[in-house]
Amino acid sequence: MVQRKSNLHYNIYGKGIPVILVHGFGEDGSIWDNQVNFLKDYCKVIIPDLQGTRSSPLMEDKNTLTIEHMANDVKDLLDQENITQCILLGHSMGGYITLAFAEKYPNYLKGFGLIHSTAYADNEAKKVNRARGIEIIAEYGGYSFLKNTIPNLFGEVFKEGFSDAVDELIEKSKLFSNTSLQAYYHAMMVRPDRAFILKESQLPILIIAGTEDVAAPIDDLHEQAKLSATKYFHVLDGVGHMGMWEATKQVNEFILNFIENI
């Protein structure tokens, strides 16, 4: 493992085609540990911590951070490593960043993917919920907020059978400042719809969905998968928003198949 830091702290594992895995809201790069341990024998895996996460400082104000800022951070990472083409995969908020990157820097990509993520912008009800979340974080703290929301990300079978893993993710959430969490929520709330990227891109696109995912509903992802002619679309039965943990073997195989077929 090689540790590097630009604006972002990131780790590099293995050799070969560069594959960047971007974590989501309330997570850090360790969310991908199960994927790293598998994929590092097949490719160069790069795991950044987004700004405001762990050792990566928050560079923007909580009211000015955007998804595009975080996509630019990924571009800076690639430039620092002299990487001119990669595969970019994002989980949840990381998928929003991946789409913003695909819009702005398509020539850097051999392919990209959304793992439990959506190209749609927040609807009005979701924006209201985001705004309320920002208020709750300010009033009660980020840890309290995530302690209540994280369990809802998992499918029922995993949540009941692997409560220790759910507790582990909750415990890691203590690392986040209130400001960082509010900044992420604001960035997600104001992001534009990027469904057109799926329709217009000629790049291979990976989409992984869970039938019990309440954050990235399966019906939305079915609709979005139909937009792309170059898609790899996989559905995880009985899985919520966290397939990297809930269905590790399947997710690893889906990602490797995507890499090997590009």
Predicted segments, located by residue:
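Short beta-strand element of the alpha/beta-hydrolase
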Residues: 17-24
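Conserved loop-alpha-helix segment in the C-terminal half of the alpha/beta-hydrolase fold
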Residues: 202-239, 245
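Conserved alpha/beta-hydrolase catalytic His-Asp/Glu region
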Residues: 122-128, 140-200
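Active-site loop/oxyanion-hole signature of alpha/beta-hydrolase fold enzymes
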Residues: 6-8, 13, 36-37, 43-89, ...
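Flexible "cap/lid" loop of the alpha/beta hydrolase fold
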Residues: 99-104, 108-147, 153
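Gly/Ala-rich beta-loop-alpha elbow adjacent to hydrolase catalytic centers
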Residues: 90-94, 98
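Post-His helix in hydrolase/transferase enzymes
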Residues: 245-259
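Serine-hydrolase catalytic-loop signature spanning alpha/beta hydrolases and amidase-signature enzymes
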Residues: 24-34, 45
